[in-house]
Amino acid sequence: MSTPFTLLAISDLHYTGLARQTLQPAMTRGELARILLKKVFLRLEHLNVKPDLVVLLGDLIADGKDREATHDLLALYSELTRTGLPFLVIPGNHDRGCDRFNEIFDVSPGLHTFGDYGFIVYDDTFEESHTTLRSESALKLTETIAKENPKLNLIALQHAPIYPPIKSHYPYRPTNATEIMESFQKNGVVLSLSGHYHKGQSLRINEGVYYHTVPSLVEEPYTFSLITLEGRKVEVQEQSLKLAFPSIVDLHCHTEHAYCATTIDTATALSLAKTLGVTMQCVSEHAFQLYFEKKYAMSGKWQKDTQEVQRVWETPSRNRMVNYRHFAEKLRSPYTKIGLEVDLYDNGKLLLAPEDAEEDLWDFLIGSIHFIHDFIPGKTTQAEAEKLFLRDVEQLLHLPIKVLAHPFRFFTWSHLETPKHLYPVVAEMLADSGVAAEINFHAYQSDADFIRTCIEKNVKIAVASDAHAIQEVGEFIPHINLLKQAGVTPKMFPDVLFSFT
């Protein structure tokens, strides 16, 4: 009995990072390939899936002859190695011309063994006419490997699709595809995996051999394949990065102005969000990080230091706030609303200078509890912390905020128990104030019980990426799954989720 084996298959990234932007079809988003690859691994984290092997099935870059091709390949190599997962990379026709491809990915034709499975790498010849051919020696290689490894379940990896035939003027399949199929069938190959044909072809079986063509990661709907192998049993689950659900308004996405941001880039984030089907992508930034220098901001001391707050507010720039206002205003569009994530200071006041609190400056304010005045880590008891928390929630909800961010995250970050008995209390407070509750998975685990309680009280739900890294933009699978746990189907989204209408 073979051990189950999970395979992540990705194809046709056509990455153009440092390389010049070649004349690609408008539908091919090669410039986003590295980000989409990051998003694939983030999706796997959310699905709690750790593949046994990652395979990339060719055309990693758009032009192997470009002078920057090597650097673009190295960028993709870094994304693969940082995962700690084993991987195999197959060259495609667009990778030709880069002399260092095989060296970078340590790829070689032939057998690569992982557990009970033998992966046969084929490096087929691509002609100038775009036709491809499997050599006689490569056909014999299949037979040799099968005879020498009778207990291995064999998986064939190549760039060009083998089966089924494709109706196209472009010669996607090898000219000797029929011979290849006969070789697979005679030698007991379990599965043939290919790329090249960007639309992909779903799993099918012919003469006892499974065939699957993996779609391009950089064309809608930005798909990769999760494949489960168990002996000769094969199952394929296709995962798309593009949202298939309506009414996703993301109010909570950070910018490069945040001290806690990592790889976020606002211009790229807005383009990515639209590409992935986010209905409206807004930006919001921590007010306390804009007003104060990093060390002081992250200490939370400003909550009690009214003298320092006033000193900063009296300076013309208010540290970085004025610059952020100019930046945010240029982002405002029908697709993008601008806001701030605001905290309390001085026993219940909003940390917002009078000049920054004018009504028409911001489309929305998000209320957050990152710090609690009078809370002393390690000394304040659970019961005392709960009282302080309710005090601050009540104070926030009397201020002009539209959403309460990551409602109970303070307890998690303070190493306290999440007070689930307060769910109905906070939900009632939100209902009375007309403020939405946020679903947030940034360093936090939202609870379906709380969301369900809020919905029962007609509290709107705001889904939030709370993106600090670029790959977090547009990733709402955990939010959607949580809503399902709370009894909310996608058809109910327009009625349940927060919007500006």
Per-range role (PLM):
Residues 37-53, 130-210, 391-396:
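His/acidic metal-ligating clusters that form di-metal
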Residues 66-148, 153, 176-186, 206-213, ...:
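Extended active-site neighborhood of metal-dependent phosphoesterases/phosphodiesterases
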Residues 244-346, 383, 414-415, 420-428, ...:
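An N-terminally biased module of ancient metal coordination in phosphate/nucleic-acid-related enzymes
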